[in-house]
Amino acid sequence: MLKEWPLVAFTVAAQSAVGVFLVAALPLLAAPGPDPAARRAGLIALAAAVGALAAAAALSFVHVRHPWRARRVLANLGTSWLSREILFELAFLALAAAAGLSAWLRPGAGGLLTGLLAAAALAGTLFLTSMAGIYALATAPFRDRAWTPLSFALTALGAGALAAAWLRACGAAGPSAAAGTGPFVLLSFVSVAAEAAGAFLVAPGYGLFLRPTAPSLRPPAERHSTLHVIRMALLAAALALVGAVLAGAEGRTLLAAALGLFIAAATAGRFLFYGLAGPRPESSLRYFA
């Protein structure tokens, strides 16, 4: 399970990057009217998203056996989810970086910036979809479930909502944006709660209703039950912190801590995901052998 750390780092960082862009950066940069504080906060969120995705892309090369052969990966767009994933990853990275450059050089949501933001949002959404499609394999039934795309989406949504709420709560986005912190805190609470409920009930191999019943060539999933308990504890702690902010507590420190706990829980969950029985993703089977 631990040998899959490059895939764990890639998926968590990439999904968080898309979520931070869609939920934290996009609303601030696309907002009408000149607001230097909101623009600055939006650029910070966008830079964090681009940096996380660039790091995720670099980490993905650690996973492959022959990185130089990765140039072949775009040759199978019609049949391979991996090819589509890489295409949309590169498109999202380029479009998000171009949008950031446009927002920095030309303040205000002009036509060019709006178009770049919309295109980057579409590419990011398709990137997440392609990432989930890689695991839709009949030979890996524990991964080929609705929880896989849902958990990927919840990682993106939770990270993005928590980042957006924190930027507003700490005043980085300006007083006008700070006044709209509440909906993002509520969205954070719902996202973390949904992740916790899914992990407890339907996470393959560990959820209450999806525990393995057939023998496997790999060690039983119960050997990693401690990590699942840690994951649930991290999500419960994050949920408690966000709940405290909803109840009126000051959010700057609590939301930052909740974001860290949520990312840690997502990382633990991804290690459990890759520890399930089944073939490795096609990235290490078809293109780089």
Regions found by a protein language model. Give the residues of each.
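Long, contiguous internal "core" modules enriched in hydrophobic/ aromatic residues
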Residues: 5, 11-15, 32-37, 78-80, ...
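Cytosolic, membrane-interface loops and tails of multi-pass inner-membrane proteins
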Residues: 66-77, 202-221, 276-289
